[in-house]
């Protein structure tokens, strides 16, 4: 008999068929309590769980006593209670490699669009403000040869450094938990403490996961150390930044602009002050959102779940220590 799994995300037909070759699949729209109650028997017998964006906590795990592996269609997993998974020896799989290049493209797009005010001036054209040759009030700032500060030199940070170094001749500063020899050798990146980076960088790009240590890592004190001409980019997780402090820094001119793909609350409330600031480019968490990459992420998540339930945790496993 095939193992049973819960699928809480729509998949392309070919990937759904691949799952069905290996498992008995119960599809549900979400993991809300009423959905779990409606499909109680399926949840109680499920050995696998696959989807994205929903919260997986102790309350849900209590309804899934046979669960052996969960696979998320994402690189981030802050919506999972990892301690609760570990306590129950449930493997957690994610997709850290397939989205690297696409997310780095998005970060570079934020750098360019904020510096050159692409979104702002495009809207001015659309509403009929381009009635004569443009003047300095339409000008942006250069990107090439400006100093890029990367906070978090993981796979995405490395891919961003490659684009900045070779494409725009940008000197690279970085701060991370440890030195990154590849970044230093390939892109002449220079490791420095966070304060030094904040004071020297023209662009500060935050690419960090959300953990207890990184929550509100960036607040008023950090923005105060940045140049008044600096542009801040966040493409990691929203709660790494104290959004109230960011808004204050933007409104006061303490920093020049911000390009944001993530927020403390998502979707971003329509009354957020960020949406009324012309020096903010706000995206709806589209870092990996291309047709190609989202398909590849889903395919990776499917393969991850198949591997996990076969006891293969050599790659893409958050907590391999719980494997039996």
UniProtKB/Swiss-Prot annotation:
Residues of the active site: 237, 266, 285 (proton donor)
Pfam family, one: 2-Hacid_dh
EC number(s) reported in the record: 1.1.1.79, 1.1.1.81
Keywords tagged on the record: Cytoplasm, NAD, NADP, Oxidoreductase
Main localization (coarse): cytoplasm
InterPro entries, per database record: D-isomer_2-hydroxyacid_DH (IPR050223), D-isomer_2_OHA_DH_cat_dom (IPR006139), D-isomer_DH_CS (IPR029753), D-isomer_DH_NAD-bd (IPR006140), Glyo/OHPyrv_Rdtase_B (IPR023756), NAD(P)-bd_dom_sf (IPR036291)
Compartments, record wording: Cytoplasm
GO cellular component, one term: cytosol
Annotated catalysed reactions: glycolate + NADP(+) = glyoxylate + NADPH + H(+); (R)-glycerate + NAD(+) = 3-hydroxypyruvate + NADH + H(+); (R)-glycerate + NADP(+) = 3-hydroxypyruvate + NADPH + H(+)
CDD domains on file: GDH
A single MF term (Gene Ontology): hydroxypyruvate reductase (NADH) activity
HAMAP family: 2_Hacid_dh_C_GhrB
PANTHER family per UniProt: 2-HYDROXYACID DEHYDROGENASE-RELATED, GLYOXYLATE_HYDROXYPYRUVATE REDUCTASE B
Family according to the record: Belongs to the D-isomer specific 2-hydroxyacid dehydrogenase family. GhrB subfamily.
NCBIfam families for the chain: PRK15409.1
Complex formation: Homodimer.
Function: Catalyzes the NADPH-dependent reduction of glyoxylate and hydroxypyruvate into glycolate and glycerate, respectively.
Protein name as annotated: Glyoxylate/hydroxypyruvate reductase B
């Amino acid at each position: 008999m095939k193992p049973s799994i819960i699928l809480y995300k729509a998949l392309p037909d070919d990937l759904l068929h691949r799952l069905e070759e290996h498992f008995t699949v119960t599809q549900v729209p979400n993991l809300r309590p009423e959905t779990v109650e409606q499909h109680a028997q399926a949840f109680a017998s499920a050995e696998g769980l696959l989807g994205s964006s929903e919260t997986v906590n102790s309350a849900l795990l209590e309804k899934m006593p046979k669960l052996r592996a969960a696979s998320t269609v994402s690189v981030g997993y802050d919506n999972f209670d990892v301690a609760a998974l570990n306590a129950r020896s449930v493997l957690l799989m994610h997709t850290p490699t397939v989205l690297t290049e696409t997310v780095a493209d998005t970060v570079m797009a934020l750098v360019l669009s904020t510096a050159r005010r692409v979104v702002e001036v495009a809207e001015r054209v659309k509403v009929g403000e381009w009635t004569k040759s443009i003047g300095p009030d339409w000008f942006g700032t250069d990107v090439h040869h400006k100093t890029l500060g990367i906070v978090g030199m993981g796979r995405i940070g490395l891919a961003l450094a490659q684009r900045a170094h070779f494409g725009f001749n940008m000197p690279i500063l970085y701060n991370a938990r440890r030195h990154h020899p590849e970044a230093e050798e390939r892109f002449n990146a220079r490791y420095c403490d966070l304060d030094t980076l904040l004071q020297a960088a023209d662009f500060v790009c935050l690419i960090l996961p959300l953990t207890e240590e990184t929550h509100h890592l960036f607040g008023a004190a950090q923005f105060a150390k940045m140049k008044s001409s600096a542009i801040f980019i966040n493409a990691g997780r929203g709660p790494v930044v104290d959004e109230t402090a960011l808004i204050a820094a933007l409104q006061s001119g303490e920093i020049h602009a911000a390009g944001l793909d993530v927020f403390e609350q998502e979707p971003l409330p329509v009354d957020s002050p960020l949406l009324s600031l012309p020096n903010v480019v706000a995206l709806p968490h589209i870092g990996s959102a291309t047709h190609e990459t989202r398909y590849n992420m889903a395919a990776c998540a499917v393969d991850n779940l198949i591997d996990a339930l076969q006891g293969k945790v050599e790659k893409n496993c958050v907590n391999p220590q719980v494997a039996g």
